[in-house]
Amino acid sequence: MPEGPEIRRAADNLEAAIKGKPLTDVWFAFPQLKSYQSQLIGQHVTHVETRGKALLTHFSNELTLYSHNQLYGVWRVVDTGEEPQTTRVLRVKLQTADKTILLYSASDIEMLTPEQLTTHPFLQRVGPDVLDPNLTPEVVKERLLSPRFRNRQFAGLLLDQAFLAGLGNYLRVEILWQVGLTGNHKAKDLNAAQLDALAHALLDIPRLSYATRGQVDENKHHGALFRFKVFHRDGELCERCGGIIEKTTLSSRPFYWCPGCQH
């Protein structure tokens, strides 16, 4: 499943295609959304927001399209009039004079009023988004030490969208390697330096991935361009200590780590 950085880059692509342009055609597959088609003609997308792995498309009439791609959903940008050859099932079409965005295969799609936006179950449940520029390491540290999260093992905590939205498996693996911790650690057992390093890594690594992944220079480290240090690198040498990277399973997901320097 795509993680926060990939969802945000997808949102950027959608914004670049149709933001601010009047909608000339709107189509929804689901019957409960059909009544909104005419309401959106002539309106425009004001911005596309991400909340972890959910995407919120905001319109100028204050309606918001909520979509969660889950495992199979995917957005596509095409020139208006183009019909992609695909076996995927079309769910949403938002068309402007020159560009059209299409959502395929997703099943979790709703239209929300401003009031519903504040009470939506998923949006109420998710924690702060790691790509939110207003989220600080200090706030992350407070969440780590809160009664709700301080006794949780990182193996599960870093996959829990209620803790921080936008994290996923590759980020979990890379963050824990960066700070030299294992999935079995808990926030309550860390010293001040470890807590500080983890709070920064929980923001720095997702943001670096968002900014630079896809522009990878294999000779660069986390401080420059993003590349995987341990994810999918089992059997290779750890660049930090020379140990052998291993693969196991934690919280039902593949987990990669270096026993030589993560302890």
Swiss-Prot record:
PROSITE patterns: FPG_CAT (PS51068), ZF_FPG_1 (PS01242), ZF_FPG_2 (PS51066). GO terms for molecular function: class I DNA-(apurinic or apyrimidinic site) endonuclease activity; damaged DNA binding; oxidized pyrimidine nucleobase lesion DNA N-glycosylase activity; zinc ion binding. A zinc finger (FPG-type) spans 229-263. InterPro entries: DNA_glyclase/AP_lyase_DNA-bd, DNA_glyclase_Znf_dom_DNA_BS, EcNei-like_N, Endonuclease-VIII, FPG_cat, MutM-like_N-ter, Ribosomal_uS13-like_H2TH, Znf_DNA_glyclase/AP_lyase. It comes from the Bacteria. Its EC number is 3.2.2.-, 4.2.99.18. Belongs to the FPG family. Involved in base excision repair of DNA damaged by oxidation or by mutagenic agents. Acts as a DNA glycosylase that recognizes and removes damaged bases. Has a preference for oxidized pyrimidines, such as thymine glycol, 5,6-dihydrouracil and 5,6-dihydrothymine. Has AP (apurinic/apyrimidinic) lyase activity and introduces nicks in the DNA strand. Cleaves the DNA backbone by beta-delta elimination to generate a single-strand break at the site of the removed base with both 3'- and 5'-phosphates. NCBIfam families: PRK10445.1. This is Endonuclease 8. It comes from Escherichia coli O7:K1 (strain IAI39 / ExPEC). The gene is nei.
